[in-house]
Amino acid sequence: YKTVSVTFTEGENLLDIAKKLEDNEVCTADDFLFEFNKNQGFDFENDVDDNGDMFYRMEGYFYPDTYEFYVNDSAGNVTKKLREQFEKKYETVKAKIKNSGMSLNEVMTLASIVQLEAASEDEMPKVASVFLNRLDDPDTYPMLQSDTTTNYIKNVIKTEADNTASIEHYTECYDTYKCKGLPAGPICNPGMAAINAVLEPKKTDYYYFCNNLKTGETFYAKTLDEHEENLVKAGLAKKK
């Protein structure tokens, strides 16, 4: 039996992962997506909210790592191996999640946004605090307004949904410029640093942040006025 080693990085979505498995001749992308999003009898699956609005029910529940697979294996075997690794990692943070006042799905959803929004792991606890502060004050900040969710709609939902009605439904559930609070589910598969950032965020009174895409520097703001100045500093807007 021939084996192959495949590395998955933090922030990949299930579509990326499925393609990578197919490219490495482990199993087909379609078989993987079907099998991975089904219940496999693992305890933690009972803690995943099935709110009916998640595009892929198990998006976010894949632990990014390097795995050894058999070439031409079944998607069922592959999924089982991946679930075992996720369950191991989940056990290490399960108590923290219970104490956080958030559900597992909320933690993983926010961690997936932090994974894609933060310029570096060091910034993750502060970036998490911005989103948590906004979630804590829904009257003032009803929406998270994260571009990462619109990218997920463009790259995953619009390419994989069956029909227009389905695209419209999921867009409403995932677009953080339209929906209140968190999207319906995770938008990528975050690593441990992002999960821990959500569970142990920095205490701040920031409600905005932006990244200078060239330098990777992050600017935080308490008010919209400060944020608008930061956008200029970060090279994302012209001075008014």
For each feature predicted by the language model, list its residue ranges.
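Glycine-rich loop/hinge motif
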Residues: 1-26, 96-104
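Acidic helix-start/capping segments at beta-turn-to-alpha-helix junctions
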Residues: 10-14, 34-40
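DNA-binding alpha-helical recognition surfaces that contact promoter or target DNA
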Residues: 19, 34, 229
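Bacterial extracytoplasmic/cell-wall-associated proteins, especially those involved in peptidoglycan
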Residues: 26-27, 40-240
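Short, well-structured active-site flanking segments
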Residues: 26-36
